[in-house]
């Protein structure tokens, strides 16, 4: 499990977080994919420049 902290530009760059099974970067490292997020089991894509921190939990 990972918790990803990121800046949300839609909320004035407020730091938010999501929890997923795992996260990996795109091949060109411009996007971070967070897999199996929370209960929904969906994939969230975040621009890599907005990622603040990734923690293993």
Question: What positions do the PLM features span?
Answer:
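A short beta-strand micro-motif
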Residues: 1-11
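Generic structural motif
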Residues: 7-9, 37, 49-51
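Structured surface patches comprising rigid loops and adjacent beta-strands/short helices at the edges
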Residues: 21-23, 45-57
């Amino acid at each position: 499990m990972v918790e990803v902290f990121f800046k949300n530009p839609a909320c004035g760059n407020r730091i938010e977080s999501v929890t997923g099974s795992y996260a990996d970067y795109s091949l060109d490292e411009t996007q971070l994919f967070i897999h199996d997020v929370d209960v929904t089991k969906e994939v969230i894509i975040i621009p890599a420049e907005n990622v603040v921190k990734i923690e293993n939990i």
